[in-house]
UniProtKB/Swiss-Prot annotation:
One of its GO terms (cellular component) is cytoplasm. Keywords: 4Fe-4S, ATP-binding, Cytoplasm, Iron, Iron-sulfur, Magnesium, Metal-binding, Nucleotide-binding, RNA-binding, Transferase, tRNA processing, tRNA-binding. This is tRNA-cytidine(32) 2-sulfurtransferase 1. Its EC number is 2.8.1.-. Pathway: tRNA modification. The gene is ttcA1. It is an enzyme of class 2 (transferase). It catalyses: cytidine(32) in tRNA + S-sulfanyl-L-cysteinyl-[cysteine desulfurase] + AH2 + ATP = 2-thiocytidine(32) in tRNA + L-cysteinyl-[cysteine desulfurase] + A + AMP + diphosphate + H(+). Catalyzes the ATP-dependent 2-thiolation of cytidine in position 32 of tRNA, to form 2-thiocytidine (s(2)C32). The sulfur atoms are provided by the cysteine/cysteine desulfurase (IscS) system.
Length: 267
């Protein structure tokens, strides 16, 4: 950070992100007294931002909770092994580096030129969930932000024929872990600017050489074009995700359409 203007910008932005993070945590009751929170730290801008916000809230919160930062070293070529340990030691944050060669597995299974992100993320999730259970973690914190949630909604809508996104809080399918997304109300624009001002030691996410998920790239570009024409478009879409009317949809599991009959008419 080079000047007073940058410092003032950082301070204002930090307060803004912290406020949104606290709102999401409170609204969805993400953190309870005595929680042990595992922050999944990839070395990307969003997970750095998440860790920073939780550390700030830890100092101010009326409840007590532990934080442990966990990184999975997947043995990708060129991965800078010293970056995260040095950063976390300097901050005085408890951390653990899990070392698992998923890179070789993914490269063996996925054909050349195909995106490896899907299999890689599933393997990563399983390893992190196992670590959380083995170390008595009560909440697994992920760095997904508002834009990730909106993009996932449209990915499912366009390509899977389903209406679903990313919840701010969930109990994993196997009931072993609770996953929280404290940055759910924060935009990617905010995490990007914050990471630049804080000068986080970013680790690229494409060390494996995988191609970007073209479907997600298409959705992201589409949303950005919409946002250019209407700066509130993403906010409106995000608001819609918590303003659902089951009776105005077509899902018989969410609303009892079958038993609506002429006997219900009131005149």
């Amino acid at each position: 950070m080079t000047n007073n203007t940058d410092k003032q910008t950082l301070k204002k932005l930090e307060r803004q992100i912290l406020r949104k993070t606290a709102q999401a945590i409170n609204q969805y009751n993400m953190i309870e007294d005595g929680d042990k929170i595992m922050v999944c730290l990839s070395g990307g801008k969003d997970s750095y931002c998440l860790l920073e916000m939780l550390l700030l809230l830890q100092k101010k919160a009326p409840i007590s909770f532990e934080i442990i930062a966990v990184n999975l070293d997947q043995k990708q070529p060129g991965f800078p092994e010293e970056v995260l340990p040095n950063y976390l030691k300097n901050k005085g944050v408890e951390f653990h580096i899990i070392q698992r060669d998923t890179y070789s597995v993914v490269k063996r299974v996925i054909p050349e030129g195909k995106t490896t992100c899907g299999l890689c993320s599933r393997m990563r999730r399983g390893i992190l969930y196992d670590f959380a259970e083995e170390n008595s973690v009560t909440k697994v914190a992920l760095g997904h932000h508002r834009d990730d949630i909106i993009e996932t909604f449209f990915l499912n809508l366009f390509y899977n024929g389903s209406i679903k996104a990313m919840p701010a809080k969930l109990l994993s399918d196997d009931k072993r872990n609770i996953v929280i997304r404290p940055l759910a109300f924060v935009s990617e624009k905010e995490t990007l600017e914050y990471s630049q001002l804080k000068e986080f030691p970013i680790i690229p996410c494409n060390l494996c050489g995988s191609q970007d998920n073209l479907q997600r790239v298409f959705i992201k570009d589409m949303l950005n074009r919409w946002e250019q024409n209407n700066p509130e478009r993403k906010n409106v879409i995000f608001k819609a995700l918590s303003n659902i009317s089951p009776s105005q949809m077509l899902d018989k599991e969410l609303f009892d359409f079958i038993n609506i009959s002429k006997d219900d008419i009131q005149r």
